[in-house]
Amino acid sequence: MFSPLGSAPIWKGSDLMLTPHVEQVITMANEFNLIPVYKKVLADMETPIRIFRRYAERDRAFLLESVEGGEQWARHSFIGTDPFLMVSGKKGRLILEQHGKRQILNDKPLEALKALLRKYRSPKLKEMPPFTGGAIGFFGYDLLQYYEKLPEHSVDDLNMDDIRFMFCDQVIVFDHVKQQILLVGNVHVGEGYSDEDIRAAYAEVERKLEATAQYLRKQTPPETLGAASIPDDVELGEIQSNVTKEQFISNVEQAKEYIRSGDIFQVVLSQRFHIDTDASPLQVYRVLRTMNPSPYMYYLKMDDEIIVGTSPEALVKVENGRVETRPIAGTRPRGVTETEDIALAEELLKDEKERAEHLMLVDLGRNDLGRVSQFGTVKCDTFMEIERYSHVMHIVSNVSGKLREDKDFFDAFLSCLPAGTVSGAPKLRAMEIIAELEREARGPYAGAIGYLGFSGNMDTCITIRTIVFKKNRAYVQAGAGIVWDSVPESEYQETVNKAKAMLKAIRTAEAMFPATVQPYNSVINQDYLYTP
C-alpha cells in the first residue's frame, strides 16, 4: 500500500495559470458568488499521506480517501486545513468561529448549517472534481433528537458535539488516475463587486495557491511502513467498555422480547470500548488504511478531537442531482485460495438469514430515497452483489433516484439518517429502544462523516469502524443486529470482534512507531505557511 519514496518528489507546472481564466470568472460572477479555480502540478512521486503529513500537526485538518469496489483506489483524495469557518452544535446551541470571533445561534443544527451553506452559490464545472470546497466534518447519531420525539440518553460521558464542521475554501485534490494534484481555491465575489474587485480577489487566490505549491515543494523525510517491522500479532492489553458483558446480554434479551411482541423486526445494540494509548492518530490511520482499505477512509482533526476511520458503507450521496445509498449486509471472510473465495461468496448469497436482512435494508433505502426523489425514479441499480475487500466480502446493493427540484442534500440526508444497518427497523421504534437499553449517548458512532459541497454535491458515510481520539484515550464503538433468533452470547462476541479489529490497529501503530518520534511540525518552514 505504501510505496518507498527514497527521494524528494519532482513538482512541475506549479507556475501555470489558473483555470478558469479571470475573464471567465468575471462572467460567472453574474450568477455565482463563490467560484472554484485550480492550478495543476505533476505528482507522480507523491502520495496523499505524504502530502497530508505536512499538515497533520495543524489544529484543524482533514484527509478523505477511498477505495472503489473493494480493491481499486478511487480517483480522488481530498486534503484541507485552516478552515475559514468552524461550526459546532450541541443541545440546541450552534457556535460559529470565524477570524477569532465566536457567534452563538439558538437553532436546530441542520437549519443553521443549511442557512450558512446557502450563502454560497458555486458552479459545477465539468473539468473539476465533485468536491471543490465546502463543509467537512461529522453528524452525531443523536442529531435526530432535534427532529423526532426520542428519549434523551441519560449519560453522555464522551461529550462530543452533535455536529462539527470545517468550512474550507481551499482544497488539495490528488488525482490518482492522472498522477497530478489540483490545488483548488475559491474566488469570493462580494455583493456589488466590480470587475476590478473580482480581478483582485482572483489574484489573491492565485497568490495563496502558489504559496501552497511552494510549501508542498518542501522535502518530506521518507517514511513508509517498510521502514518498520509489521508485527504478526499484538497484545491488546486491558480494554474497558461502557457496559458489562452481563448488561449487554440482558439488553439483547430485552430487545428480543420487543421483537417477539411485534414492536420491531430488528434493532442494533452497541457498546463503546476504550483504551489508553500514546500512539499517533496519523500512524494509526496509516495502519488502518493498510489493514482495511474501504470506500470511505478519513482523518479529521478538529482541535483536541481526532476521528479516523475506514467505513465500508455510504449513508447517502448527492452528485449532480442524483441521490444514492448503498446498503451493506451480509459478511464472510475472504478465502485463502480463489476456489475457497468463490465458495464463500456462493455460501453467503445462499444464506437465507443474510438475504432477508439485506432485503429489509434495501427496502428501507428505497423508502428513504422515495421521500426526496422524483416520482418513478427510485431504482435498484445493483442488487445483492458480492463486493470483496482485503479481509472480508459483503453483499452490497445500490439504490438511486433523481432528487426532486424542491429538495436539497440536507433533505436527502435527513431522509436516510440513521441508516437501518446501525439502528434497526422500523427505524423510529428501534431508536427508542436503543435509547432505553444503551442509556449512553452514541456520539459520532452510527452518525455520518463526509463533505457538503458549496456546489450542492454531498458524500457521506456511516460512522462505523471508526476511532475517536481524545487526549491519550481512544474510543471504538461497535454494534450487532439483534433479530428474533439471536444468541446473546454470539451478539456480544460480534461487537467485541468488530472493536478488536480497530483496537489492533492502535496497538500495531504503537509497536511500529514509538512515541519518541518527533512530530513532523518540528521541520515545518513557517515561511511557506499562508493565511486564508
What does each of the following model-derived ranges do?
Residues P4-L5, I10, T224:
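Intrinsic, low-complexity polybasic segments
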